[in-house]
Amino acid sequence: MPNNAHLLAQLQVLVDFPGIDGCALVETATGMAWHVAGNFPEVERISEAAIEFWRVQHRLSEHLTALGAIQSVAYSFSNRVVALFPCCEDPGLVLVAIAAKGPVAWPAWGVKVGAFRLAVANLLESGKGLNKPPNLVTSQNG
């Protein structure tokens, strides 16, 4: 998938950031991970399950409008943090990150997320679109 090479490189940049253990670009409608990076065990399965957090937020969004547009959602577990960042509305794509509980420079990482969002937008605007990996068309993960 040559048109996704830059996107995959940007995803790897996110995972290489100190404290980040894994990332996935997940489609909100299907809950399927399109692209995954990182060495954390089961990053794909966890990311696909975590999209349910995003769906809950979306269902409750009318009650949260006074807070402004959502920029991220984070869930803290005893061993890790799962953070979700919107990337695109059509198709609905969310970046899911699994991070260490220790200090992560989230503002600096957010700048890198901005570059990733731009890579997603550029692929969509170029008319080339984002290619789902072929194995995900029939995959029944999770």
Q: Can you say where each PLM-predicted feature lies in the sequence?
A:
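Acidic, low-complexity cytosolic segments
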Residues: 1-21, 30-142
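Conserved acidic functional residues
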Residues: 27
